Amino acid sequence: MRINEIAGSKLSFDTTKGSNTIGVEMNVDGQYAGMFQYDADSGRSLVELDPTFQSKGLGKILILKGIYTAIMSGLDYVEDESRTRAFDNAMDSLADAGYIVNDDEYWYVTGEGEQYLLKQVSL
């Protein structure tokens, strides 16, 4: 995964937490770049990335941060059956890199995934 195109830029995240939901907003140099929302009751994830920031590896970082935030908030992150091809591709890439693992439809962030996030921005 790469973020070379934005090297030197500062990534930051704002998170919101509900009883069974989380939201993560990603900013690049203070500019809104995208958001991740997860509802544990329905198992639905929603990811939006501003077109300006697409094809730079940021969607994968946002998804990884979203899964990490859900798990750290005490929510089980289950696979969303209504996902898009782009979401599937990002999840496959994260799994292939060893950053997430699927255990019987429950997804977990690995130690390598956590270290990758730490390199991108403080958790």
What is each model feature region?
Residues I3-G8, K119:
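Proteolytic processing junctions in secreted/extracellular precursors
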Residues K10-A33:
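Conserved beta-hairpin
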Residues M35-F36, D41-T52:
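Conserved acetyl-CoA binding element of GNAT-fold acetyltransferases
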Residues S55-Y68:
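Conserved acetyl-CoA-binding loop-helix of GNAT-fold acetyltransferases
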Residues A70-R83:
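Conserved GNAT acetyl-CoA-binding A-motif
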Residues D88-A95:
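Conserved active-site tyrosine of GNAT-family acetyltransferases
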Residues D104-L123:
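C-terminal "cap" of GNAT-fold acetyltransferases
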